[in-house]
Design a protein with these regions (language model features):
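Regulatory N- and C-terminal appendages and interdomain linkers associated
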Residues: 1-25, 143, 147, 151, ...
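A glycine-rich phosphate-binding loop feature that marks nucleotide/adenosyl-phosphate handling sites
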Residues: 117, 173-176, 226-232
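A local structural micro-motif
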Residues: 18-19, 109, 167, 177, ...
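Conserved ATP-binding subdomain of kinase catalytic cores across diverse folds
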Residues: 1-131, 157, 161
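Catalytic activation segment of kinase domains across protein kinase-like and atypical kinase folds
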Residues: 37-48, 128-138, 142, 170-215
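Flexible, glycine- and charge-enriched loops at secondary-structure boundaries
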Residues: 84-87, 91, 142-149, 195, ...
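Catalytic-loop of the protein kinase fold
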Residues: 161-171
Length: 282
């Protein structure tokens, strides 16, 4: 097929020899099957911000570290340079996440290069060497659903231990090869410790997985893996090989509203006293 304009620089640099076909078009990127020498890989072409259909991207970028202070200031101001840097940060976030998670024992595609908004990475394949199907396209027996769901929960735990939450995990960005699930699409992955939305995103990720596999194994629908793992994470007790039960006892203790109000009043009183002393040092 005709070489897409965005992939041409990779061809010019000898990274890609042939574009075979478009594999999929998503809300944040188009993916092509490409030939690199004797290897068949895929090229993920990120869409520009104005063409992406990724809602509330700002929530996902909260807590991300920007190494260069000049870049951080430009991004905060929203200048043309800042928007360009914001785009590069969005794209490189996926590369960083892929390397981090692979080292953490999470099954993800292997990245090879990222150039001008194009990520060259492993093409995940099935037993016949064809592009692996998405989870949404694979039927399961009850037994296999339980096995794969357990694998996904294990990967989510390892991600959290590595400091990341996927943030957009669903049956549409998990591939199934001969060895089980492979997690994809990570540009929006969030910093678990620095993003105020991380807990809610984790719960949504796990709920999506549980709902899908629960179609085949209904007993999964009553599990509370997200709440269990987050509680352990907050207490510093979550480890990559932590064995979860899927059970979580919600706190039944009533909130001490009166006590909280007393603390607030005490803080206000202290601040008022401090201001009085500042105005009248004698």
């Amino acid at each position: 097929m005709k070489i897409p304009k965005r992939i041409q620089p990779l061809v010019d640099d000898g990274l890609v020899d042939e574009v075979i076909r478009r594999l999929k078009s998503g809300k944040e990127a188009d993916v092509y099957v490409v030939r690199c020498g004797q290897d068949i890989r895929c090229a993920k072409v990120y869409k520009e911000a104005e063409n992406r259909n990724f809602k509330q991207a700002v929530q996902y970028q909260e807590g991300r570290k920007v190494r260069n202070s000049r870049d951080a200031r430009a991004m905060a101001k929203g200048s043309k340079f800042g928007r360009k840097q914001q785009e590069e940060t969005w794209q490189t976030a996926e590369v960083d996440a892929l390397y981090l998670l692979a080292n953490a024992g999470v099954r993800v595609p292997q990245p090879y290069a990222c150039l001008d908004g194009v990520l060259l990475m492993e093409l995940v394949t099935d037993e016949d060497g064809l592009a692996a199907p998405r989870l949404s396209d694979v039927p399961f027996s009850k037994e296999q659903a339980l096995i794969d769901h357990a694998a996904m929960i294990r990967y989510v735990v390892r991600m959290l231990c590595a400091g990341l939450v996927h943030g957009d995990l669903s049956e549409f960005n998990v591939l199934i090869d001969k060895d089980g699930p492979v997690i994809t699409d990570l540009p929006q992955a969030v910093n678990a410790a620095a993003n105020n939305h991380a807990k809610a995103m984790l719960e949504r990720d796990v709920a999506n997985m549980t709902h899908y596999y629960g179609q085949y194994a209904p007993e999964l629908l009553g599990t509370k893996y997200a709440k269990e793992m987050w509680a352990l994470y907050e207490d510093g007790k979550l480890h990559p090989e932590t064995s979860l039960t899927g059970e979580f006892a919600e706190s039944t203790q009533a909130a001490d509203v009166e006590g909280v109000l007393e603390e607030i009043q005490a803080v206000i009183a202290e601040e008022q006293e401090r201001l009085r002393e500042a105005q009248d040092p004698y």
